[in-house]
């Protein structure tokens, strides 16, 4: 019921159009997190293949949600909670993910090029085959994260707790 109310509210406040591929298009939308809080936000929502390019979802509770193949490039997701969410193949290129929780989330094959993951919680996250080219992981926690096959070209690991046990606390 809460998910229905959330989507009803969103459909009443924004014009949501469908792309040719059937994905919802909420590009450039600023969501009122106060309203999302009243509706228990979007815990467990199915938002696969949705277009959230440059959307503002800062502080949103999206734990357990399905964002498979979602487009979130340039989005502001600072302080959001994606704990246990499925984000397989999602695109976060250039997104602000500062202090975002991805604890135990499935991030297999995601694009995180040039994303800001400063202070992010990536403990036990599956980042296998993820593209972290030029991503900033300063102060992030990657304890027990899976980075098998991940692309780490130019990734910043300053003061980061890595899965291989290094905290990089001496970097400047």
Predicted regions and their residues:
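Tandem repeat scaffolds
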Residues: 21-172
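N-terminal signal peptide c-region/cleavage motif recognized by signal peptidases
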Residues: 15-17
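Positively charged n-region of N-terminal signal peptides that target proteins for export
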Residues: 1-4
């Amino acid at each position: 019921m809460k998910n229905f109310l959330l989507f009803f509210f969103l459909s009443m406040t924004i014009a949501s159009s469908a792309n040719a591929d059937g994905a919802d298009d909420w590009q450039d939308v600023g969501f009122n997190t106060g309203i999302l809080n009243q509706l228990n936000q979007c815990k467990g929502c199915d938002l696969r293949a949705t277009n959230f390019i440059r959307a503002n979802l800062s502080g949103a509770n999206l734990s357990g949600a399905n964002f498979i193949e979602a487009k979130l490039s340039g989005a502001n997701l600072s302080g959001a909670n994606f704990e246990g969410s499925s984000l397989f193949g999602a695109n976060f290129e250039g997104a602000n993910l500062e202090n975002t929780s991805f604890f135990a989330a499935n991030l297999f094959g995601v694009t995180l090029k040039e994303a800001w993951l400063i202070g992010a919680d990536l403990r036990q996250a599956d980042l296998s085959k993820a593209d972290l080219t030029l991503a900033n992981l300063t102060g992030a926690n990657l304890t027990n994260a899976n980075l098998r096959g991940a692309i780490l070209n130019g990734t910043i690991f300053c003061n980061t707790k890595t899965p291989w046990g290094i905290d990089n606390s001496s970097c400047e």
